[in-house]
Design a protein with these regions (language model features):
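Short, ordered loop/turn segments at secondary-structure junctions
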Residues: 10-13, 27, 34, 112-113, ...
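Gly/Ser/Thr-enriched, mixed-charge loops and adjacent short helices
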Residues: 18-141
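Structural motif
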Residues: 3-6, 21, 82, 106-108, ...
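Acidic, glycine-rich loop-and-beta core segments that form the ion-binding/anion-interacting portion
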Residues: 123-177
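Gly/Ser/Thr-rich loops at beta-strand to alpha-helix junctions
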Residues: 13-14, 89-93, 153-154
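Ferredoxin-reductase
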Residues: 1-25
Length: 177
């Protein structure tokens, strides 16, 4: 395991945007600390005091299977169900579909082919117009629910089996019960 990483993401923003999340020693770098890094990142003449090969190592790893194994190990579904996953042509779509399949559910993928131009709709589930296709597919597939993710999976909106939007604040009320 590593306590460090960088995720290139624009989250729920349009394709013209990009950014990243930095994790150092298991802590997300944000706020003032992140602001202090920006001038260094913009500095084309940035020189390191040490040669790059002496500063550590870079390891590229496919962490998806390990992540899915972990989630499956700690999950306890009482019953399987049918759902539609709208991935908005972003990374969470195929991962969520694999996860629910592994949990014994029947997951129908919708826009789960990764394409950063977002040809079907922007990866913003907070915008109702981006949920119309998912609502229709949930009803057509007679699914129990639908999930709409943003570009990096830190936002989700649920669609009920009747095609009704269940907003995140409503989900919190359900979870509080």
């Amino acid at each position: 395991q590593s306590g460090n990483g960088i995720m290139v993401t624009a989250s729920h923003n349009p394709a013209t945007y990009n950014g990243f999340k930095i994790i150092l020693q298991h802590q997300v770098i944000s706020g003032e600390t992140l602001q202090q890094l920006i001038p260094m990142m913009r500095d084309e003449n940035l020189h390191l005091d040490k040669p790059p090969e002496s500063m550590g190592s870079l390891v590229e790893a496919d962490i998806v299977s390990q992540y899915l194994d972990h989630i499956v190990d700690i999950s306890r579904l009482e019953k399987s169900f049918k759902l539609v996953v709208d991935g908005a042509n972003s990374v969470p779509g195929p991962i969520a579909t694999q996860l629910f399949d592994r949990l014994g559910c029947l997951a129908f993928p919708l826009y789960c082919d990764i394409d950063g131009s977002f040809p079907n709709h922007p990866p913003n589930p907070a915008d109702e117009k981006n949920l119309v296709d998912l609502q229709r597919h949930v009803i057509d597939q007679q699914a129990e629910l639908g999930l709409a993710f943003d570009g990096d999976g830190d936002r989700v909106v649920v669609i009920s089996g009747r095609g009704r939007i269940v907003w995140p604040d409503q989900l919190m009320m359900i979870f509080a019960r």
